[in-house]
Regions:
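Hydrophobic transmembrane alpha-helices of secondary-active transporters
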Residues: 39, 99-125, 258-261, 279-301
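Transmembrane helical segments that form the transport core of multi-pass membrane transport proteins
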Residues: 238-322
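Structural signature of hydrophobic alpha-helical transmembrane segments
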Residues: 20-32, 83, 96-111, 155-165, ...
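Membrane-embedded hairpin module used as a gating/binding unit in multi-pass transport
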Residues: 193-266
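Alpha-helical membrane segments and immediately flanking helix-loop junctions
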Residues: 104, 112-118, 133-143, 147, ...
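Alpha-helical transmembrane segments
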Residues: 182-200, 310-318, 341-344
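N-terminal alpha-helical transmembrane segments of multi-pass membrane transport
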Residues: 1-77, 90
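Entry/N-cap segments of selected transmembrane alpha helices
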Residues: 123-145, 295-322, 373-377
């Protein structure tokens, strides 16, 4: 009988339960499992960015279970700062190979390709001044960069943290894998959580910075945009951005290629593939592999707390920057621009534009701002990619 109990004790000692609850530092893994469950709750029950939070949350769950070698961070982050191909070949598993798409910067541009097939740039083409609102909303990126520097982060780390303010998860991942891959888990989780919380974060700032009269402004319908303009737009933008800022060319180029495929109407089959099947597959790979980087040993530290705080500051300042420029444009145009559309300059598409619409209708139920807000919203996508290119050019 004693031998049976001894065997049971040995089995328990080798189990994951013992590693979590009876080893030094095991509590960290329990905390991370709780965080993973919170992300899954937000994705499934609250439906906050479920397409990303669900795979990220499950990846976080898997990597913080006491399993042997689901993900080997030392393959990608080591003294040489290069992928250890020999170690990958000898010890790499499925997640390691999937993560190559993140490390090599493959997934974010492909996500942009898919986004391009679903994006309508007509509101931006019809009202080019929307570009200014999209640019103003990137203020949060550079403000947070300065804040991160003050807190002691390096230039590369500060740039990666700052890009959270663009409200663009793929761009944040793209920049972080280039500049500060050791912060990828924290930055990705912060970026996507705050993207999901745009309807919660933005309204108080929008109300605080605008008057009731400004929120009630009804904007005139934008002009009609010809098909020729829609086709020329992605081509011209790609040329200008690529020649001006080569480091942003891959993101902006893929975005514009996807849009050109859509607007040309001559490659309907691959347009649907890029916007549906390819986009869905890449989303699964990206979310799950990024979630697997959030191991308790590297995630639970003071840096993560600072990143989360800086991230919400970035969102707040970006929203405020867009609204304040919207107020200036309202003044200059003698009340023809509703300042609420400025908050849509962050590139959370289309959530930020929907928030502008909702706040406008609260002030005036007959006010429809969605199409007007989509201009700054899609301009913000371009703006965040350009900001990413600036950081990579400076610190890459």
């Amino acid at each position: 009988m004693g031998a049976i109990f001894t065997n049971i004790a040995e089995i328990f000692a080798k189990s994951g339960w013992a590693q979590i609850f009876f080893t030094e530092g095991g509590w960290k893994y329990a905390v991370m499992l709780a965080v993973a469950c919170v992300l899954l709750y937000l994705a499934i029950v609250k439906q906050f960015e479920p397409l990303l939070l669900l795979p990220i949350g499950f990846g976080m769950l898997m990597t913080n279970l006491p399993l042997d070698g689901i993900f080997h961070m030392d393959i990608f982050i080591n003294e040489t700062n290069h992928i250890d191909w020999a170690l990958l070949g000898s010890s790499g598993g499925m997640v390691d190979y999937i993560y190559l798409g993140v490390k090599l910067g493959i997934y974010p541009p492909l996500i942009f390709l898919g986004i391009g097939t679903m994006t309508d740039f007509e509101p931006l083409i019809a009202r080019p001044s929307s570009l200014l609102l999209g640019a103003a909303a990137q203020l949060g990126i550079f403000f947070t960069f300065v804040g991160a520097k003050i807190l002691g982060f390096t230039n590369k780390e500060a740039a990666s943290i700052g890009i959270i303010g663009g409200a663009d998860g793929p761009t944040a991942i793209f920049v972080t894998t280039r500049l500060a891959p050791h912060l990828l888990g924290s930055i990705a989780v912060a970026a996507y959580c705050y993207m999901a919380l745009v309807p919660v974060i933005q309204p108080p700032i929008m109300k605080a910075l605008t008057t009731e009269k400004e929120r009630q402004i009804v904007m005139t319908a934008p002009r009609r945009v010809s098909k020729t303009e829609k086709i020329l737009f992605p081509i011209i933008v790609t040329i200008i951005v690529a020649l001006t800022l080569p480091d942003a060319a891959i993101l902006v180029g893929c975005l514009m290629m996807g849009n050109l495929m859509k607007e040309s109407g001559v490659v309907e089959r691959i347009t649907k593939t890029a916007g549906n099947e390819l986009m869905n597959i890449i989303t699964i790979f990206l979310g799950f592999s990024v979630g697997c980087t959030t191991n308790a040993a590297t995630f639970l530290n003071i840096q993560t707390v600072e990143i989360i705080v800086l991230g919400i500051v970035a969102f707040g300042v970006g929203t405020a920057g867009g609204v304040l420029l919207g107020k200036v444009m309202c003044l200059v145009t003698h009340g023809k621009i509703n300042p609420l559309i400025g908050s849509a300059g962050v590139s959370a598409v289309p959530m930020a534009a929907r928030v502008s619409q909702k706040e406008g209708q609260r002030a005036d139920p007959g006010n429809f701002l969605l199409m007007h807000a989509m201009g700054p919203n899609v301009a913000g996508v371009i703006g965040s990619a350009v900001a990413a290119g600036v950081f990579i050019a400076l610190f890459g």
